[in-house]
Curated annotation (Swiss-Prot):
This is 4-diphosphocytidyl-2-C-methyl-D-erythritol kinase. The keyword Transferase applies. Transmembrane segments: none annotated. The lineage of its organism: Bacteria, Bacillati, Cyanobacteriota, Cyanophyceae, Gloeobacterales. Belongs to the GHMP kinase family. IspE subfamily. It comes from the Bacteria. The active site is at residues 11, 135.
Length: 302
């Protein structure tokens, strides 16, 4: 039996601006996205029918799981009716703004491309992923990218290599992505907004590879919706700054926040300051230039 095992990287937003509402009711976005080395492990094995298992109680095992949707999209595209067993080992916090569900789905697309010997290109996998969720095309490739449209129109940026950060999330808190966007739309969105000058400033800072230039330019429109409703997220963001982070921001729709650091030692020092807080998930992470990494592909007669 053939087995494929992959590492599916988390994503952070260095920039997220909501420009307006599209005719298809999605939001028009400008984002700068970055993969980090916090990752789930996704294992795929041939099976008569598709099933998914995960030890995390909040991860569904039905077709509401984007990983199952990824199988269905590939089956429809290729005409293959085989099933697959999907085992997800979660390290990325669930419902946290780190694209955990999307990156698992991206791993399923990439893994089935190997398991079923499909020969699809990365661009084809991205196009299929866009049918499932807006973050999935980025998760397929990973790295550092400018994302526009609803997030699926990607332009690679100069690789942001070896940047350390601290990810922090209150363990018992989840924020609905749909709620965050709808709240922003209702309370803050004005039609015809043009991208702010800080977009180009951040792109220049990313190209410079200087974390000290990037940190003050972090921006996320969704903080305006989420932080007033979840003051504990705002407090955690401020705690990262007071602990010494160069800059801190909520990722995506939250509630995970991250703080940028000068180097690994600095990140570990910031993490140590927060380590005593109860109910807090903390990770020292580093940027990486891949979304999905193949760990293992093997065949067995068992």
């Amino acid at each position: 039996m053939k087995t494929v095992r992959l590492r599916a990287a988390a994503k952070i937003n260095l920039y997220l601006e909501i420009l307006g509402v599209r005719p298809d009711n999605f939001h028009e976005l400008v984002m700068v996205l970055q993969s980090v080395d916090l990752a789930d492990t996704v294992t795929l094995r041939a099976a008569p029918t598709t099933r998914v298992s995960c030890s995390h109680p909040l991860v569904p095992n039905d077709r509401t799981n984007l990983a199952v949707r990824a199988v269905e999209v590939l089956q429809k595209h290729t005409g293959i009716d085989e099933g697959v067993e999907i085992v997800i080992e979660k390290r990325i916090p669930v419902a946290s703004g780190l694209a955990g569900g999307s990156t698992d789905a991206a791993a399923v697309l990439a893994g089935l491309n190997v398991l079923w010997d499909l020969g699809l290109t990365q661009r084809q996998l991205q196009s299929l992923g866009a049918q499932i969720g807006s973050d999935i095309p980025f998760c397929v490739t990973g790295g550092t990218a400018l994302a526009m449209g609803r997030g699926e129109v990607l332009s690679p940026l100069p690789a942001l290599k070896g940047v350390y950060l601290v990810l922090a999330k209150l363990a018992d808190l989840q924020v609905s992505t749909a709620w965050a966007y709808q709240t922003y739309r209702r309370e803050y969105l004005s039609e015809g907004t043009a991208p702010r000058a800080r977009t180009s400033a951040l792109l220049s800072a990313v190209a410079s590879q200087e974390v000290a230039r990037i940190a003050p330019l972090l921006h996320n429109d969704l903080e305006r919706a989420v932080l007033p409703a979840y003051p504990q997220v705002s407090a955690l963001r401020e705690h990262l700054v007071s602990a010494g982070a160069l800059g801190a921001m909520m990722s995506g729709s939250g509630p995970a926040v991250f703080g940028l650091a000068r180097d690994r030692a600095h990140a570990e020092a910031v993490c140590a300051v927060l380590a005593g807080e109860p109910g807090l998930e903390l990770f020292v992470c580093k940027t990486q230039q891949a979304g999905i990494l193949m760990e293992e592909s093997e065949s067995s007669d068992l």
